[in-house]
A protein has these predicted regions:
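Amphipathic alpha-helical hairpins
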Residues: 2-153
Length: 153
């Protein structure tokens, strides 16, 4: 049987305060509750927190990418759209931090390969196009649409 800080198996003891019984598992990071959970719930909690870390990284890095995209845009309307999305990121990051807190977890990031790839592609659009050109703006719009589709998914 495996024993670690995120999953404790029945009939095992840990020194972290996550005591177990035959009935089930204590939720990791939630040492103040007397509620017991099933192995599936614990596994889901770990999975869910892992996905939150991924999303948290994506939101934080998207803000940096949007700042670059805004500076690279020629059209004032496009620049304004990037700035608006940039400002919305603060709210989304705060909401994620609230969710981490409700789960008894510290907000942590885990590199999101999908967002990293999309932001790298946006950087390529900037470096591969002429400054102050319609083509660059079109490339930035395309990159932003891809990011938006990822966020929806």
């Amino acid at each position: 049987m495996k024993t670690d800080n995120t999953k404790t198996m029945p009939n095992t003891k840990t020194t972290t305060g996550n005591k177990t019984t035959e009935e089930g598992y204590r939720m990791p990071g939630n040492k103040t509750t007397d509620k017991w959970t099933s192995p599936a719930q614990t596994e889901f909690h770990c999975f869910f927190v892992d996905q939150l870390k991924d999303i948290y990284w994506a939101e934080k890095h998207l803000k940096k990418g949007l700042k670059k995209m805004s500076k690279a845009a020629t059209s004032p309307k496009l620049r304004d759209a990037f700035e608006k999305h940039y400002n919305e990121g603060d709210k989304q990051i705060a909401e994620l931090e609230t969710i981490f807190g409700l789960l008894g977890e510290k907000p942590e990031t885990k590199r999101c390969e999908a967002m990293a790839g999309l932001l790298e592609e946006a950087d390529g659009m900037i470096s591969d196009t002429q400054k102050n050109s319609f083509v660059r703006d079109a490339g930035l719009i395309l990159a932003a649409q891809k990011v938006e589709h990822y966020e929806i998914a």
